[in-house]
């Protein structure tokens, strides 16, 4: 059998780990077998990736099916946990965007060399505070599954977990929005699902709470995009306030 191996000869006149990482990053990208998160794993070894990967080892993520054998093998659970971290760092909803995930892995790799003027307007962080807050929100959702086990199977869908997580984060930074209600959320979730697939151009259905319709539409199609995530948040906020 014949094999082709990429070979790159480099001469380093100085000790530069970042340069070496860039070389291996190019080689890994040319291999065309690694997904984006696996490439990050090969390139970074600082605070952000260490935090995300260590967090992924918690059994809680297996309990709610965020971590499964298939997802873990491709590091998709780590990628999703990275999104939760970014939501926490920015205190706002973000759409699924590989570029901003890459930016966070780079900017928060070495916290001592953080770029205050970064193009993403990402803030400098207190790593201990971020970990503490992450643990608080995780425990809050864990307690919800104990309060009502019906929530647990819903969480295997990343969009549901992200919707709850981002709402909890935002409500703690905005006292004007209604508090999260597990009972109301499960009603919203189940009633929205009962509608089946609703056309995105439908504004309302006769006799149906409009928030059910809005949540249903935002939960379909490209449901990890920013507009859909915000639409689910707005439907939750309106429903909790009723």
Regions found by a protein language model. Give the residues of each.
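C-terminal subdomains that position terminal phosphate/3'-OH groups for nucleotidyl transfer/ligation
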Residues: 93-242
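Basic- and aromatic-enriched surface patches that contact anionic nucleotides/nucleic acids
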Residues: 1-106, 201-206, 212-226, 230, ...
